[in-house]
């Protein structure tokens, strides 16, 4: 009788229970000390490619499995070809790691290998002479339970909010003195300690004190600021540093943008320059989403004054940016503050018809009419007068930011492709605007010769330059996602294995020695936020690792929880090369 389907599912699950990512085993070796190296990751076993495989790497495997060392590091599927995915490639260990997962490599599931390159090892027959029973993992919870009991204490801890007691705990000096993170509680003599805490952080104090015992703590988007604040105030340097690393992970998790704004305000108040810089970068790259978010009306004026001068502001267009400021304005800012913001708008980046319509579409216009007329005149000169005359008679430096584009994501200046490793041949990114309908961006795949693979490819055109003088002069572009060396060859690019995948960009037409380009590539995570922005250098743009791995590639500024980017937007950014001092 055939066992029911549920039974087989049970067998499958049972076979991987108790196995952790990075665990290793030897297969098909005919003896316990040799075989094909297999490593566990995300619920399944896979193999390791023999690229760069050496005795140091093999010894890490052998020691992890209880042997003294490795005697041979074998490749070319010496113990037969495995099945499942190639988990790791180009592994480079130092010899001290607990697992191959801790060694430098291309990262999980990133390999051009086939199973005929599976790595194997032969370990010494001798196992280690010392056998260890290690129950230390239970110690953390046991110490936490001592704190939970609130018994047998010799230290009184009062939690004070604005001069009034809010909570009380007791502690055990003998445990706390063993942890430098808790030194603020025991370095002063006496049996009484008072902690002054902001009201919003009171609910986190118990978890902080328990952390001093168990050395384990759970941190969420809503609690990270308070834990960072408490750790900073009470000298818990490891916790403080760990919270700092979480900000980049947690910032994108609040689509309302209240938390990023709150963290920015916290960074300014505490003088945390690194956190302030991180918040500004996230808000700049995701400025379009911010303007559509619930928190947009509450963005403080001083923050906008820092964001609006930036060239890395990602917005559909300069007109869209000005309209967003108009929506934000209302009655919240003074006349002088609003004028300061309008001064930072790049009017030359708006077309003449857009400039003309401002008087009919903006509530700001008539309350600041003189300023708008002045900025409009400046922009119209840029659009209608050749740059040589502007530089000669007006003394304008056309390389200033006012005359250069930001990161404009509208179809006029950008194109989108997806990652072919998970896309179908015809794909779409669907972005749900918080204030509008679904917007879909489609991406075609290049019809290559029959012996080629299909790779996401987009042909598009842009104006040669933002000036209206160039509106009839079009430049043709081709954007392609290149995941392999072969794909680079197919499309005329030279790539090395350690830089893949990359985006390739080619240009045809519109040659002008006075115009240069600073093109950008936006890494999009789950259609929800911009995780990173890279430059096109030599017509290629690097694609960072979506998550922090042991890969030699840099990690995305804001990690993508999915483990991959769902798409890439390329933005064309032309500008004049010359300035007033060099023009005849």
Swiss-Prot record:
CDD domains, per the entry: BACK_LGALS3BP, BTB_POZ_M2BP
SMART domains: BACK, SR
Residues with glycosylation annotation: 69, 125, 192, 361, 397, 550, 579
Keywords tagged on the record: Cell adhesion, Disulfide bond, Extracellular matrix, Glycoprotein, Secreted, Signal
Domain BACK: 260-359
Gene Ontology cellular component annotations, sorted alphabetically: extracellular matrix; extracellular space; membrane
Stored PROSITE patterns: BTB (PS50097), SRCR_1 (PS00420), SRCR_2 (PS50287)
GO biological process: cell adhesion
Disulfide partners: 49-113, 62-123, 93-103
Complex and partners: Homodimers and homomultimers. The multimers form ring-like structures with a diameter of 30-40 nm. Binds LGALS1 and LGALS3. Binds ITGB1, COL4A1, COL5A1, COL6A1, FN1 and NID. Interacts with the gamma-tubulin ring complex (gamma-TuRC), composed of gamma-tubulin, TUBGCP2, TUBGCP3, TUBGCP4, TUBGCP5 and TUBGCP6. The unglycosylated form interacts with PDE4DIP; this interaction, which is PDE4DIP isoform-specific, may connect a pericentrosomal complex, made of AKAP9, CDK5RAP2, EB1/MAPRE1 and PDE4DIP, to the gamma-tubulin ring complex (gamma-TuRC) to promote microtubule assembly and acetylation.
Principal location listed in the UniProt entry: secreted
Protein name stated in the entry: Galectin-3-binding protein
Domain SRCR: 24-124
Entry function: Promotes integrin-mediated cell adhesion. May stimulate host defense against viruses and tumor cells.
N-terminal signal peptide: 1-18
Glycoprotein as UniProt keyword: yes
Any matching Pfam family: BACK
Subcellular location: Secreted; Secreted, Extracellular space, Extracellular matrix
Domain BTB, residue spans: 153-221
């Amino acid at each position: 009788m055939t066992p029911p389907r549920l039974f087989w599912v049970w067998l499958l699950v049972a076979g991987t229970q108790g196995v952790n990512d990075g665990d290793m085993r030897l297969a098909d070796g005919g003896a316990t000390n040799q075989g094909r190296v297999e490593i566990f990751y995300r619920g399944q076993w896979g193999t390791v490619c023999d690229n760069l495989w050496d005795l140091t790497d093999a010894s890490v495997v052998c020691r992890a499995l209880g042997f003294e060392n490795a005697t041979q590091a074998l490749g070319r599927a010496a113990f037969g070809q495995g099945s499942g995915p190639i988990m790791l490639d180009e592994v480079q260990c130092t010899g001290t790691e607990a697992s191959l997962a801790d060694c430098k490599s291309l990262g999980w599931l990133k390999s051009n290998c086939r199973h005929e390159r599976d790595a194997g090892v032969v370990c010494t027959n001798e196992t280690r002479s010392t056998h260890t029973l290690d129950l230390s993992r239970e110690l953390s919870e046991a110490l936490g339970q001592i704190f939970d009991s609130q018994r047998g204490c010799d230290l009184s801890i009062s939690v004070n909010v604005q001069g009034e007691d809010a909570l009380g705990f007791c502690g055990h000096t003998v445990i706390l003195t063993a942890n430098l993170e808790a030194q603020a509680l025991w370095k002063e003599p006496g049996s009484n300690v008072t902690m002054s805490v902001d009201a919003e952080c009171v609910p986190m104090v118990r978890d902080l004190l328990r952390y001093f015992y168990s050395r384990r703590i759970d941190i969420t988007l809503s609690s990270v600021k308070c834990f960072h604040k408490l750790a900073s105030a009470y000298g818990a340097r490891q916790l403080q540093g760990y919270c700092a690393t979480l900000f980049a992970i947690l910032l994108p998790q609040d689509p309302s943008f209240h938390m990023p704004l709150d963290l920015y305000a916290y960074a300014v108040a505490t003088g945390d320059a690194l956190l302030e810089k991180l918040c500004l970068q996230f808000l700049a790259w995701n400025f379009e989403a911010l303007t559509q978010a619930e928190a947009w009306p509450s963005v403080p004026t001083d923050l906008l004054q820092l964001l609006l001068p930036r060239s890395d502001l990602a917005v559909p267009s300069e007109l869209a940016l000005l309209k967003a400021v108009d929506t934000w304005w209302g009655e919240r800012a003074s006349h002088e503050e609003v004028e300061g913001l309008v001064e930072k708008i790049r009017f030359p980046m708006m077309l003449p018809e857009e400039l003309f319509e401002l008087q009919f579409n903006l509530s700001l216009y008539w309350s600041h009419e003189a300023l708008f007329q002045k900025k409009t005149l400046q922009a119209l000169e840029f659009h209608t007068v050749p740059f040589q005359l502007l530089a000669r008679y007006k003394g304008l430096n056309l390389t200033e930011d006012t005359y250069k584009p930001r990161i404009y994501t509208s179809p006029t200046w950008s194109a989108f492709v997806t990652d072919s490793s998970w896309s179908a041949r015809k794909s779409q990114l669907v972005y749900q605007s918080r204030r509008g309908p679904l917007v879909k961006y489609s991406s075609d795949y290049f019809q290559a010769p029959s012996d080629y693979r299909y790779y996401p490819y987009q042909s598009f055109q842009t104006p040669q330059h933002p000036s209206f003088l160039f509106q009839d002069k079009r430049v043709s572009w081709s954007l392609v996602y290149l995941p392999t060396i072969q794909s680079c060859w197919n499309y005329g690019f030279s790539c090395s294995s350690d830089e893949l995948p990359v985006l390739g960009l080619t240009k045809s037409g519109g040659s002008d020695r006075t115009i240069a380009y600073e093109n950008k590539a936006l890494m999009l995570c789950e259609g929800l936020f911009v995780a990173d922005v890279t430059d096109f250098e030599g017509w290629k743009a690097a694609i960072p690792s979506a998550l922090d791995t042991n890969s030699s590639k840099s990690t995305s500024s804001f990690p993508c929880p999915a483990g991959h980017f769902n798409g890439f937007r390329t933005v064309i950014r032309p500008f004049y090369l010359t300035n007033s001092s060099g023009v005849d």
